[in-house]
Amino acid sequence: MVGGEGLSNGYKYRLQQPLQTAPGKFDENIAVGLDYLLAEMDKRQMKAVLHFTNTWEWSGGLSQYLEWNGYPATPFPKDPSFDWNKFQQYVAQFFTCEPCKEQVDTYIRYVLARTNTITKKPYVQDPAIMAWEIMNEPRPMTLAATPAFETWMRHTAALIKSLDKNHLLTTGSEGDAASDRKIDVFERVHSDPNIDYLTIHIWPKNWGWFRDTATVKGMPVVIGKARTYVDNHVVVAQQLGKPLVIEEFGLPRDGQVFTPDASTKLRDEYFAAMFGMMKAHPIIVGYNFWAFGGTARPIPGQVFWKKGDAYMGDPGGEEQGLNSVFDADKSTWAVVGKYLKTMK
């Protein structure tokens, strides 16, 4: 992501150092951090895909814009009284909040007007950036909000392309899981000529495809459902004549044990199956597994992130180590390496 929005408002698991501290107010130190990241990626011939905001509360996201414009406090997921339907209804208000949408436009203009302080390259000309995404996992959240959601997506895509004609643009979509399995919403959003390629995310655990990854007999169901999900969205990509990227997919370690010494046999099997789908569907042009955990490690006896902990691939409100692939996960890296060889 480009950066978070808003300072802490009582939700302790959110990003602690946002780029946008208040509407139209930006922390230059954080912006320089992004400059540094892009400069280092460029040295290594790596490419960034950057999204501007988030459906979810852990980076501020749409909820933060609502709070900035006088809406009640966000109903946070870790609150004992949390209600998923109320959260959806809350976030859906963003798409009819005119000042909220204007503030996102201001944020986008700020980012796309920036010149990297290290490389001196304007962001709109930076080869380290492969693509922009409108947001992470855009969802209308309610059926009633769908028309306003689609209108906002088209508006935002047009704004980004008007400011940057050099980079690719995509949505950041999960696929039809974002719209109660109404794949026509996914198709309409990606039919926009300003959108260059399609994205999907696949989350077997979050979507209730299994109860325990230690149960080997459950893996055929997981892999079968993943294949069906991919196949359904491949059809849309083929109809639109645009490439498809599977840009988020992950699985916990065996038995949902989060420590690095726990087996990743089932995760490795899942990754191999996902990578293998490209052979059957050449319109799939890339993958991004979730997520790189690096040298960070879960802290014994602690489930969620606390201030001062090392960052890994899992957002602070998720179990630390849940989907992270650590630097020492040799078998998983072997699967990834085998796939990379087929791409060369």
Give names to the regions the model predicted.
Residues 1-209, 219-243, 249-336, 343:
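Active-site mouth of glycoside hydrolases
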